């Protein structure tokens, strides 16, 4: 949240925050005898996800109320594996999605799916914040993943304002073809 506030302030941007309550219980694995209580269990776990989302929403609203930026908060509840549509629906209206690094010792299991939903369902560019320095000055060193796709070109176009201010831009060429008129050349 702090990184989003800093980014919004430095770019005179509007910050939208999604507070997502995730039901992590996978209902497909109940045993046969659980059929009478399964609907109650599903409702209980969804209710808990809703309480979690609303608690986060209250904390986010309290934090943002003291800030001098434009902001909005959205809250959603979804089951594990089914929240991609909700994330994508909101991400498609964003110019940029800020997400924590999806891998590492403190990463939540759903962070990878949230990033993928923003990128592929929402078709939004994403800025992955480093896990060890989430509030550091970001955008000085940028890594671009290039695979010659339309998506890669759209991401680079969307990132041009950040790329122009970067001190160093690295291009990671992903699975380049061995031959062809448009062969990627990292040199």
Stretch-by-stretch model annotation:
Residues 1-42, 121-122, 134, 138-187:
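Small/aliphatic-rich secondary-structure junction motif
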Residues 6, 85-135:
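Gly/Ser-rich helix-loop-strand patches that form or flank binding pockets
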Residues 15, 71-75, 126:
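Generic structural signal for residues in well-ordered beta-strands
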Residues 22-24, 47, 59-97:
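Structural beta-alpha unit
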Residues 38-55:
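A short acidic, glycine-rich active-site loop
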Residues 73-78, 104-107, 148:
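Short, flexible loop segments at the rims of nucleotide/cofactor-binding pockets, characterized by
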Residues 78-81, 105-106, 177-183:
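Short, small-residue-enriched loops and turns at beta-alpha junctions
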Residues 83, 111, 152-155:
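Amphipathic coiled-coil/heptad-repeat helices and related helical stalk/stem segments
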């Amino acid at each position: 949240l702090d990184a989003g506030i800093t980014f919004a302030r430095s770019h005179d941007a509007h910050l939208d925050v999604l507070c997502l309550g995730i039901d992590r219980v996978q209902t497909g694995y109940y045993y046969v005898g659980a059929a009478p209580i399964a609907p109650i269990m599903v409702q209980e776990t969804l209710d808990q996800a809703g309480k979690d989302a609303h608690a986060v929403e209250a904390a986010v609203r309290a934090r943002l109320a003291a800030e001098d930026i434009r902001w909005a908060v959205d809250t959603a509840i979804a089951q594990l594996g089914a929240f991609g549509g909700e994330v994508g629906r909101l991400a498609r209206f964003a110019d940029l999605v800020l997400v924590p690094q999806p891998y590492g010792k403190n990463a939540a299991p759903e962070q990878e799916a949230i990033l993928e939903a923003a990128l592929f369902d929402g078709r939004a560019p994403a800025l992955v914040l480093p896990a060890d320095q989430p509030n550091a000055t970001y955008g000085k060193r940028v890594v671009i993943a290039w695979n010659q796709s339309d998506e890669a070109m759209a991401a680079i176009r969307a990132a041009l304002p950040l790329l122009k201010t970067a001190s160093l831009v690295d291009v990671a060429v992903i699975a380049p073809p061995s031959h062809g008129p448009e062969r990627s050349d990292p040199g």
